[in-house]
């Protein structure tokens, strides 16, 4: 596998820390050891997150092409767009963000706090759009790029989740490579890695990265899109492309992609009671914050897998915390009583 042939622009602190979730493990019976990989604090740029790690492999192309404006898209409380805004500010570039109405949630402050507030503070041109949630290339995003060109700028397109970019999976191939180094220091290997999946490139990169040591099927994606067929197809397509890029040496198959579809509902961006319980439980036992859109759902999934005995006794399970806590303010009504 050859990741080193791709240029990387450093935006993170390096390998994110691994912390044991001792109290949560004990609360769930103590038969499975839970750990967290803290991608939620991987950078000093506006709280970081998994997209910041992905952007390390996209930004060299933007610089090489002489682009002056990063153009991205997400929902109103998109973590992606906040991280793109932070990187643009860091590099001295302009930033245009299309924020679509992906979530059927009507909190009075939803479009004024959290991620979107931070993007505005960092100087991004934030454009609200009424379009609902879907996966793939969006007309509103293409129009935003055309607008930049018409105004004499040179846009660099960053699709939702970085996932439609050819290099969108590389950051989490690197994640797997760095984790192997950390495992050597810890003196053990993780039996399973749990990760949230929506647009697909985070899990796709992990699948490729861990295929190098035979653990691709040990990456358990937890769907948060409520469109699991689309998400799984995305993961597989991106993983196959990424495997070719890094010269993995074998084909990625459908069997390599494990996606648990039980925890995404009622729909994208809206938590169920199990997700809210998981957010409160992890927060109160570990001081680790997760959000109702992504990480709360993958945390819910991991907790339920432990409760149901789906991990063999003695397993060491790594929860990939991808970020997302800045969105909590937008859901303040749900937590008005804690």
From Swiss-Prot:
Per its UniProt record, the required cofactor names are: pyridoxal 5'-phosphate
Quote the EC number: 3.5.99.7
Q: Which reaction does it catalyse?
A: 1-aminocyclopropane-1-carboxylate + H2O = 2-oxobutanoate + NH4(+)
* The entry's keywords: Hydrolase, Pyridoxal phosphate
- What's an example GO BP annotation here? 1-aminocyclopropane-1-carboxylate metabolic process
The active site annotation covers: 78 (nucleophile)
Query: Sorted alphabetically, which InterPro entries does this protein's record hold?
Result: ACCD_DCysDesulf, ACP_carboxylate_deaminase, ACP_carboxylate_deaminase_bac, TrpB-like_PALP, TrpB-like_PALP_sf
The UniProt GO MF terms for this protein read: 1-aminocyclopropane-1-carboxylate deaminase activity; D-cysteine desulfhydrase activity; pyridoxal phosphate binding
Q: Where in this protein does the record say N6-(pyridoxal phosphate)lysine is found? A: 51
Q: Which SUPFAM superfamilies match?
A: Tryptophan synthase beta subunit-like PLP-dependent enzymes (SSF53686)
NCBIfam families found in the cross-reference section: ACC_deam (TIGR01274)
Describe the function of this protein: Catalyzes a cyclopropane ring-opening reaction, the irreversible conversion of 1-aminocyclopropane-1-carboxylate (ACC) to ammonia and alpha-ketobutyrate. Allows growth on ACC as a nitrogen source.
Task: Give the protein family.
Answer: Belongs to the ACC deaminase/D-cysteine desulfhydrase family.
Put simply, this protein is called 1-aminocyclopropane-1-carboxylate deaminase
């Amino acid at each position: 596998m050859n990741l080193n042939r791709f240029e990387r622009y450093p935006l993170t602190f390096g390998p994110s820390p691994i912390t044991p979730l001792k109290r949560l493990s004990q609360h769930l019976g103590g038969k499975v050891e839970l750990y967290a990989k803290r991608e939620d604090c991987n950078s000093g740029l506006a709280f970081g997150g998994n997209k910041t790690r992905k952007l390390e492999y996209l930004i060299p192309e933007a610089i090489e092409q002489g682009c002056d404006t990063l153009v991205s898209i997400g929902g109103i409380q998109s973590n992606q767009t906040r991280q793109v805004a932070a990187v643009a500010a860091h590099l001295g570039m302009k930033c245009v963000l299309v924020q679509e109405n992906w979530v059927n949630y009507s909190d009075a402050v939803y479009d004024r706090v959290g991620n979107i507030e931070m993007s505005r503070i960092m100087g991004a041109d934030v454009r609200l759009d009424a379009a609902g949630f879907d996966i793939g290339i969006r007309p509103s995003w293409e129009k935003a790029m055309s607008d930049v060109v018409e105004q004499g700028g040179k846009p660099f397109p960053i699709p939702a989740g970085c996932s439609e970019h050819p290099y969108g999976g590389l950051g989490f191939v690197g994640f797997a490579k760095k984790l192997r180094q950390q495992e050597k220091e810890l003196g053990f290997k993780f039996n399973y890695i749990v990760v949230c999946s929506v647009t697909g490139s985070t899990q796709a990169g992990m699948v490729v990265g861990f295929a190098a040591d035979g653990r691709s099927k040990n990456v358990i994606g937890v769907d948060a899109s409520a469109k699991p067929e689309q998400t799984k197809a995305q993961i597989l397509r991106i993983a196959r492309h990424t495997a070719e890029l890094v010269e993995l040496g074998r084909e990625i198959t459908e069997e390599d992609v494990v996606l648990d579809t039980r925890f995404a509902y009622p729909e994208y961006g809206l938590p169920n009671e199990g997700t809210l319980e998981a957010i409160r439980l992890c927060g109160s036992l570990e001081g680790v914050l997760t959000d109702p859109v992504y990480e709360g759902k993958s945390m819910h999934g991991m907790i339920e897998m432990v409760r149901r005995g789906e991990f063999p006794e003695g397993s060491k399970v790594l929860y990939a915390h991808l970020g997302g806590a800045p969105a909590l303010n937008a859901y303040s009504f749900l937590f008005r009583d804690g």
